């Protein structure tokens, strides 16, 4: 599935032309630090009206867990009341972040993404291929959806990946100038709709801001939920062992009909 990612820097976009060009999805910058992207709401409305699958990303400047929590709160407020067929990604690429250890960077990612998961979002991580391999822990790479950037004819990343940003100089009908080009390898719209994430009620209907499954700005006293993203070769038995639970508990918590059938990219709730 072919897509693009955009921010205010693409200016005014003719989304009907973008859709007609063969683009299937778009990941829109919702904000950065504690700021909302000035064109986020405009881009969201236009992409939705054109029939594109829509996701979002939040560019991080966080240098502490507290700052990552604040960014997550800003992100949730910005996304509230909207539905997204694609994941919500945390964009980590600032040099002063990547100068830190893998444990430090992974703590930022886990803080932000867990906060989004508690609010009902399907969270993921955006990073360039090299720091993704050296500045994150295996637990982070296995737990969250991965969107890796590498401008090449192929992605030289050995781990499981859901999306690849393959160019920063693409040309797309309806957009003036360059735009990032992406390729998606996982059927996120199906997973997200069926799972009731990102503003959809379980089974695929948009919640419209009123369903109990709609992402909330404040998680209140609701218990924290942990999710695991299924990778190629995973089994429920292995996941159960990893999280010290049972296959039957996983089956019950996720409404799984056949314990022998799970698929790559699926979010498994850990009871």
List the predicted regions and their residue ranges.
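Primarily a LysM-type cell-wall glycan-binding module
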Residues: 216-248, 266
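Functionally critical loop-and-helix segments that line ligand-binding/catalytic clefts
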Residues: 1-10, 16, 20, 139-217
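Substrate-binding cleft of extracellular glycoside hydrolase catalytic domains
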Residues: 1-122
């Amino acid at each position: 599935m072919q897509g693009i990612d955009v921010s205010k820097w693409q200016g005014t976009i003719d989304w009907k032309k973008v859709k007609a060009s063969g683009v299937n999805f778009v990941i829109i910058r919702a904000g950065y630090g504690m700021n909302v992207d000035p064109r986020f709401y405009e881009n969201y409305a236009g992409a939705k009206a054109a029939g594109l699958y829509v996701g979002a990303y939040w560019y991080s400047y966080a240098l502490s867990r507290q700052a990552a929590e604040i960014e997550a709160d800003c992100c949730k407020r910005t996304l509230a009341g909207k539905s997204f067929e694609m994941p919500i990604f945390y964009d980590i690429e600032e040099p002063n972040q990547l100068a830190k250890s893998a444990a430090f960077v992974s703590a930022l990612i886990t803080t932000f993404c867990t906060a989004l998961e508690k609010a009902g979002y399907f969270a993921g991580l955006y990073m360039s291929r090299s720091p993704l391999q050296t500045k994150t822990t295996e637990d982070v790479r296995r737990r969250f959806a991965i969107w890796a950037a590498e401008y090449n004819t192929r992605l030289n990343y050995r781990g499981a990946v859901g999306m690849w940003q393959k160019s920063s100089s693409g040309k797309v009908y309806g957009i003036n100038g360059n735009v990032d080009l992406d390729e998606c390898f996982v059927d996120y719209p199906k997973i997200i709709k069926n799972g009731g994430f990102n503003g959809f009620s379980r089974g695929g209907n948009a919640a419209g801001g009123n369903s109990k499954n709609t992402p909330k700005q404040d998680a209140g006293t609701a218990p924290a939920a942990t999710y695991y993203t299924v990778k190629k070769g995973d089994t429920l038995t292995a996941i159960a062992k990893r999280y010290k639970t049972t296959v039957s508990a996983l089956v019950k918590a996720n409404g799984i009909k056949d314990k022998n059938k799970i698929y790559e990219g699926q979010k498994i709730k850990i009871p």
